[in-house]
Amino acid sequence: MLETKRIARVKALVHNLTRWSGWMGIVGVILFATAWFWFPFPIENFRQYDASRCITDRNGEILRTTLSPQGQRCLPIPLADAGKWLPVAIVATEDKRFRRHHGVDFLALSRAIGQLAWNREVISGASTISTQLVRLANPRPRTLPSKIIEAFRALQMETILSKDEILEQYLNRAPFGSNLVGIRAASLHYFSKEPTDLSLTEASLLAGLPQSPSRLRPDRHPQSAKKRRDHVLERMVECRFIEKDRSKASIQMPILLEPWTPPFLAPHFVDSILQGKLNLPSQTTLDLHFQKLTEDLITRHSSDKAHGTGVVILDAANGDILAMVGSPDYRNKRGAGQVNVTLAQRSPGSTLKPFAYALAMDRGLLTPEEILKDNPLNLPGYQPKNFDGNFRGAVSARQALIQSLNLPAIEILRRIGQKSFLETMQGLGLTTLNETRDHYGLNLILGGGEVRLLDLARAYAKLAQAKPGDTISPEAAFLVAKILSGNERDLAVFG
């Protein structure tokens, strides 16, 4: 009788537990669905990185990298540029079922809970690449509530991002020691290589670092780093990413680091981009080959007193900057070496004369063989002279341009009109000529204003590539270019 009552009580208890667990399950599902709706996944946190600025030339050669706003060196790259070995090494060591679960590895979670209950201590973890990514993007204290939130967010994330997108995000956000974030910064720092160039041994070393970046830094703790690397290689064998023989061969390899010195190239050019003076993307138009040739040329031909030398080379077809050197020696503080002469406002000297000649020819106000007077001229408070102080008398327009004579240039400016010429030069990009025509007077044609070398070079590029409908016609531009070309100039100067 007592046995029958005991059995009845047990059955009632089981029935009540089943009923309550059913109700609790329903409530849990409702709460989960409500949370999913009311707390949508913060995708905006994953659309940008706390990234460094990486300035490169037109071919992708790094000119300079900066630290991120948080003081990190982070150089995000697409998964396609992560190389052959790093992604699979990360998966093998951090989350071998990454491609099979949906953000939370319930099998690993069950194992971890069982081990904790049996051993009363944590034996293995159950975090996934997805949950780690959630924590990297939005750090929280490592508490049980935080882990529940991370698991919830990981489940949400897997419905929005693909596995490749999640892996790419993780590879760009994982810590690798010091202030290094992401695989590209780590690959460059430790091996002076892009991730695509890493060997299996090098990739497996990096893949082991996110577990404990400070303790496993190979430049400070090589033995610990090697032990972790070897573990990664063994995990790659378990996951069948590599053969055992290959793993054994890699384990025998010592750690060979090649510390990276961050480049500091084309300093004036890069400074101008970082300071907002040049509106260019991170992959710039500069050609490092031309840049080095230009720097070498200036170094060879500049004296100690020549602090104001600057060169800018443009692609005449589109105005792209191919090389920019702002001074002979960037590091010469005494000589103001960090001043970028190509962006400083300076007198253009006689460099505006070809534009005046072209404009006058374009408007039918001048022909190359027309005779002009190179005689003394008295202006109010000013007596312009030629560079050598001599006057030639009657000269052709061709000879006047080649010899850069001042008095004929003033006559041409008078024919064009000061206002018209000033507006033309402003339209060609010389925006620093922003005073009135009365401010400059006739001296404008002789260098009376201030322009930037870069703007002047771009104006000449437009002249060289003149098209129908431009301010100066192709025909007039051709005539001026022909006069100033080598053969014409030599004939006029040397006979």
What are these model-derived regions, one by one?
Residues 284-304, 311, 324, 332-341, ...:
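A penicillin-recognizing enzyme superfamily signal
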Residues 154, 219, 225, 250, ...:
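Active-site-proximal helix/loop microenvironment
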Residues 118-142, 196, 260-275, 366-421, ...:
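Conserved catalytic neighborhood of penicillin-recognizing serine enzymes
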Residues 74-78, 329-344:
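A short, polar/charged loop-to-alpha-helix boundary motif
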Residues 56, 312-316:
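Short hydrophobic alpha-helical segments used for membrane anchoring or interfacial signaling
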Residues 1-305, 320-322, 327, 375:
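Juxtamembrane regions of bacterial inner-membrane/periplasmic proteins
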Residues 89-91, 95, 236, 294, ...:
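Active-site SXXK
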Residues 99-109, 181-184, 244-247, 335, ...:
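Short, well-structured active-site flanking segments
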